[in-house]
Amino acid sequence: MASQRNDRIQASRNGLKGKVLTLDTMNPCVRRVEYAVRGPIVQRALELEQELRQGVKKPFTEVIRANIGDAQAMGQRPITFFRQVLALCVYPNLLSSPDFPEDAKRRAERILQACGGHSLGAYSISSGIQPIREDVAQYIERRDGGIPADPNNIFLSTGASDAIVTMLKLLVAGEGRARTGVLIPIPQYPLYSAALAELDAVQVDYYLDEERAWALDIAELRRALCQARDRCCPRVLCVINPGNPTGQVQTRECIEAVIRFAFEEGLFLMADEVYQDNVYAEGSQFHSFKKVLTEMGPPYATQQELASFHSVSKGYMGECGFRGGYVEVVNMDAEVQKQMAKLMSVRLCPPVPGQALMGMVVSPPTPSEPSFKQFQAERQEVLAELAAKAKLTEQVFNEAPGIRCNPVQGAMYSFPQIQLPLKAVQRAQDLGLAPDMFFCLCLLEETGICVVPGSGFGQQEGTYHFRMTILPPMEKLRVLLEKLRHFHAKFTHEYS
């Protein structure tokens, strides 16, 4: 410390003032944060796009962003009813226009009446607009077959991500071996590892079983938990269903087993259910943790703590930019729930347009309303096309030597395993790169296809994967898959 002070004094005498904030003085937890979905691969993709705009010759004419689940960036059209209501809310003068259906006008008027000054530009209360929270509660009741939901247990949020991080902030505590441990699936969505690094929590990995279509195995949960108790205090179990990046849909039997395990081991359950509308595989069905927990009866229904999350960014909506979401808490301590409300109030409120959109998602047009027919047709078209693209992706990858892809049962991604030659692995190590990062960088430079290496999500040692979204339009997806298959064959030959 004394030498650093002397260095600063000497620099000052020389007319130089050192930076207060440097890599050495900044929060070390932030330095440890990594987020592969928007990591180095994506930064290089942005550079390539800029080079193409400047006329630099490349082996491709466009960069295809298959790295992120951003449906509308990939060309998916917004749901008409949602945009009509939003337009009316943003510019209420349109309420007198004959170009908008009456049910859209009624919905917009209801939202505006709940806003301060009847304006979408006003702050809402921190937990979200009350009528929209009531709509969310009614949606959960319908989804779960009549099981009650209390609006007071629902908090609207800036996408599901913000609610997940808020919940982790409440849960992470202690020092040393008493520090909170959080069990997360591997492969995982990097939000979890990034948030845990930022909060200085202990990440506890449990591995999904790739040989059984990414099944969640209770024996593996128990292994991870027992080993973790030597270095931390495991208090939280995170489950992503349907899975990201793995695309599996958990069975009801599996969910029941997870709930029993969490109850027996004293773990708070976090259920990331943002892909609940994205289920494609025959025989697969989404079961909410809230529904299963309640139907299991006491003591689980009355004692097991649960937070479940949903979002407007995924599903058939794909409204990522509006940042709308919610969390529902079950069996949370009443005093802790007050602390949660306090923590959310520091952020003032979630974006009000995102709240409005969440309200539309959970309360879409009904069969008796004029917008229903178009809404239903648009919704079914999106989901049917996603199902077809999921099947095509699995089929093309599994026909390619050296690539193996589990069924894409749900969500928006495939996560194929790729075989990489030893020379390629050695070359990657020489460059200081993970082997699948090296593969993905080479793929990007040669084809313009941007995917995320499996090492950014976590994977079993000695295996290599990449995550690719199934969102591109069907004609572009076919070309993308063929290019990927051809490139892998060429890459394998080059390094054999």
UniProtKB/Swiss-Prot annotation:
Pathway: Amino-acid degradation; L-alanine degradation via transaminase pathway; pyruvate from L-alanine: step 1/1. Its cofactor is pyridoxal 5'-phosphate. It is an enzyme of class 2 (transferase). InterPro entries: ALAT1/2-like, Aminotransferase_I/II_large, PyrdxlP-dep_Trfase, PyrdxlP-dep_Trfase_major, PyrdxlP-dep_Trfase_small. It catalyses: L-alanine + 2-oxoglutarate = pyruvate + L-glutamate. Its EC number is 2.6.1.2. SUPFAM superfamilies: PLP-dependent transferases. GO terms for cellular component: cytoplasm; extracellular space. The modification Phosphothreonine is found at residue 22. The modification N-acetylalanine is found at residue 2. Mainly expressed in liver, intestine, colon and white adipose tissue. The modification N6-(pyridoxal phosphate)lysine is found at residue 314. The keyword ATP-binding does not apply. GO terms for molecular function: L-alanine:2-oxoglutarate aminotransferase activity; pyridoxal phosphate binding. Keywords: Acetylation, Aminotransferase, Cytoplasm, Phosphoprotein, Pyridoxal phosphate, Transferase. One of its GO terms (biological process) is biosynthetic process. It is found in: Cytoplasm. CDD domains: AAT_like. It comes from the Eukaryota. Catalyzes the reversible transamination between alanine and 2-oxoglutarate to form pyruvate and glutamate. Participates in cellular nitrogen metabolism and also in liver gluconeogenesis starting with precursors transported from skeletal muscles. Belongs to the class-I pyridoxal-phosphate-dependent aminotransferase family. Alanine aminotransferase subfamily. This is Alanine aminotransferase 1. It comes from Mus musculus. The gene is Gpt.
